[in-house]
């Protein structure tokens, strides 16, 4: 339902899937247990733009279903669209927290180098 592309290939082994399709499979497996919290660490790293967008759309659907999602990612623009709250960590410590609209260019440059 969330990943129609995988539905077409449901009888194939996971080894035959592309990297992006394998990532979708991993997320789908994690969702089978109806988690209260989903942790995604660089879930779209190294994936094609098409697959990356598909995964971000699924994250938006999950967010609307009230599933808490902790996303660790470098895609600042996409995170600003999806996130309810931001935490910036350096060496294991929170150096900034707030809402996406509060994240200024200066803060991003200082802590994220962007």
Segments (PLM) and residue ranges:
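Catalytic Walker B motif of ABC-type/P-loop ATPase nucleotide-binding domains
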Residues: 38-41
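Conserved catalytic motifs of ABC-family nucleotide-binding domains
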Residues: 34
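ABC ATPase C-loop
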Residues: 30-31
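H-loop/switch region of ABC-family ATPase nucleotide-binding domains
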Residues: 73-74
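Conserved ABC nucleotide-binding domain
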Residues: 2-15
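A short, surface-exposed alpha-helical micro-motif characterized by mixed small hydrophobic
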Residues: 79-81
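Helical segment within the ABC ATPase nucleotide-binding domain
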Residues: 53-65
């Amino acid at each position: 339902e969330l990943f129609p592309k995988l539905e077409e290939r449901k009888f194939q082994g996971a080894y035959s899937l592309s990297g992006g399709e394998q990532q979708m499979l991993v997320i789908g497996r994690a969702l089978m247990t109806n988690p209260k919290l989903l942790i995604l660490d660089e879930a779209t790293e190294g994936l094609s733009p098409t697959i990356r967008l598909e995964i971000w759309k699924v994250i938006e659907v999950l967010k609307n279903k009230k599933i808490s999602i902790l996303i660790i990612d470098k895609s600042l623009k996409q995170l600003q669209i999806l996130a309810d709250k931001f935490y910036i960590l350096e060496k294991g410590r929170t150096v900034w927290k707030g809402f996406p609209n509060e994240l200024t260019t200066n803060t991003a440059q200082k802590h994220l180098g962007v």
